[in-house]
């Protein structure tokens, strides 16, 4: 991917206007369907299967908070396979938006900064569940693990769950790191 680089002094960089916040978009059904179709070969190759426990208690049009462990690059494909056709927005680092913001927003990504308090993210998540009526996919570990094991969750995740006031769904994956390590 090519990134445009502009040479400027430190003072010129500071004089740049601040980035304007954009509200999240409801994920496009077209992009969700393409992602599901593109995911199929990898999931078939891994003999992917899942067990849904208690999902019948959540209505198909009811937004929820989806918490998923993050152990390899197949995570998004697995989430799409498990949750399809339920629309969901994905919490994603802002550096993933460089050069492809329109695509990331069309898929339903919400930009955030890692490892710091981000009140804008909480407001965006509230906007998704209350206004857009979409679920939110969150990887609370905030990074891939290097050995496929789970890392401790931050204590602030409880505050987030309480603020959203929606059902919580947990997707726990096993063995995918062995298939597609980092």
What is each residue range found by the language model?
Residues 1-14:
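Soluble, non-transmembrane catalytic domains of enzymes that act on hydrophobic metabolites at membranes
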Residues 60-117:
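Catalytic core of membrane glycerolipid acyltransferases/transacylases, capturing the structured
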Residues 32, 38-70:
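Helix-to-loop junction immediately C-terminal to a conserved catalytic motif
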Residues 110-133:
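Helix-adjacent hinge/juxtasegments
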Residues 82, 103, 128, 159-163:
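Hydrophobic/aromatic ligand-binding patch that stacks against planar heteroaromatic rings
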Residues 148-182:
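A cross-family acyltransferase "interaction/gating" segment
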Residues 128-158:
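Catalytic-site beta-strand/loop segments enriched in glycine and acidic/polar residues
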Residues 63-65, 133-139, 169:
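Residue-level preference for the first positions of well-ordered beta-strands
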């Amino acid at each position: 991917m090519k990134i445009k680089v502009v040479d400027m002094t430190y003072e010129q960089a500071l004089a740049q206007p601040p980035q304007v916040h954009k509200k999240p978009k409801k994920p496009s059904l077209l992009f969700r369907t393409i992602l599901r179709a593109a995911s199929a070969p990898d999931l078939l190759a891994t003999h992917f299967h899942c067990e849904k426990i208690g999902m019948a208690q959540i209505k198909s049009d009811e937004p929820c908070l989806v918490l998923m462990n993050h152990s390899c690059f197949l995570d998004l494909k697995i989430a799409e396979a498990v949750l399809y056709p339920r629309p969901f927005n994905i919490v994603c680092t802002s550096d993933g938006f460089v050069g492809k913001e329109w695509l990331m927003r069309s898929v339903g990504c919400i930009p955030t900064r890692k490892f710091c308090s981000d009140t804008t993210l909480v407001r965006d998540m509230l906007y998704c569940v209350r206004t857009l009526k979409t679920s939110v996919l969150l990887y609370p570990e905030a990074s891939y693990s290097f050995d496929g094991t789970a890392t401790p969750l931050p204590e602030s995740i409880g505050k987030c769950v309480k603020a959203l006031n929606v059902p919580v769904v947990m997707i726990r994956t096993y063995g995918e790191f062995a298939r597609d390590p980092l």
